[in-house]
Amino acid sequence: MKARAKEWLMPFFSGFWGRLRRRGGNMSLADITFINMCKDILENGTSTEGEKVRPKWPDGTPAYTIKKFGVVNRYDLSKEFPILTLRRTALKSATDEMLWIWQKKSNNIHDLHSHIWDEWADEDGSIGKAYGYQLGVKHQYKEGMMDQVDRVLYDLKHNPFSRRILTNIYVHQDLHEMNLYPCAYSMTFNVTQKKGERRLTLNAILNQRSQDVLAANNWNVVQYAVLVHMIAQVCDMNVGELVHVIADAHIYDRHIPIIKELIERTPYPAPKFWLNPEVKDFYQFTRNDVRVDDYVTGEQIRDIPIAI
C-alpha cells in the first residue's frame, strides 16, 4: 500500500507547482496543510491491513487504514479562515454541529439540522453520555456551579492569563454509556498579548485521539476555527492560532483513490470569513451568524463510504 502511494505521488508533486504558478501563486494555506498531511500519511504512514480493527464497512469488511501518529497542524486564524477550497466544506452544517455540542450541550440528534449522527443514536435519538452531555455537566468551583463551557468563558473574561482554561469530554467513568467515544475530546485555550496591540489574542489547541482524514479533517478544523472566532468575539479578543493535534490521523483503504484525486487538484484563494459582529453573547450565536464570501472550490465529492 505504501509503495503504491509513493509511485503516484512523485509525478503529482512535480506538476503541482506548475499548475499553481499558472493560477497566480495565490492559494489557501489550509489546502497546503491538507495536501502535505495527506502526502505524509501516504508516504510515511503505517498500514493496519491484516490487524484486528474495530471499524467495518457497511458490507462487513474490516476497514483498514494507512495511519500517521502525532500529526500537528497549525492554522493562523488572523491570516485566513482554514476552510478547504479543494472541495467544499459545508460551513453552516459544521457550525450547527459545533453549536449542538458547545452551546446546546445536547446529546440528542433531534436537536441537529443534519443526519450525520444517526448511525450512533438510539431509538430516542440519544448518543448517550457523549460530547455535549459532558460539556453540560455542572461542577463545583469556588465561584459557584458551572459547566465546562461557562468555566472557559468565565476564566477568559476574568483571568485570561490562566494556564488552566480547558475542556475535556473523555470522561472514563462514563465511557460505557457513550454510543461513540469522543474523537475530538479536549480544547485548551491560551491568551497572549501581542506587542503594540490593545486587545488580547485568543489561541487554542484541539486534541483529537483519532481522525478520518477524508471525511472529518477539514470539518473539524472549520468547526473549531468558528468556535475560536465566536469565543474571541464575546471576550473582546483577537483570534490567533488554532493548533490541531491528532494522535491517529488515518486514511481508510477505500478512501485512498479519492484522496489521490483530491490532492491533485489546484487550490483556490482562501475565502473571507464573516461572523455577525452584533452577537456579544456566546449563547445567542446561530449557524446563520457565519458566512464565507468569495468561496470558490473544486467539485464536491459525494457518496464517500463511511466506516462504522
What residue spans do the PLM features occupy?
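Terminal, non-catalytic protein-protein interaction segments that mediate quaternary/complex assembly
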Residues: 20, 24-308
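Accessible peptide chain termini
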Residues: 1-2, 27
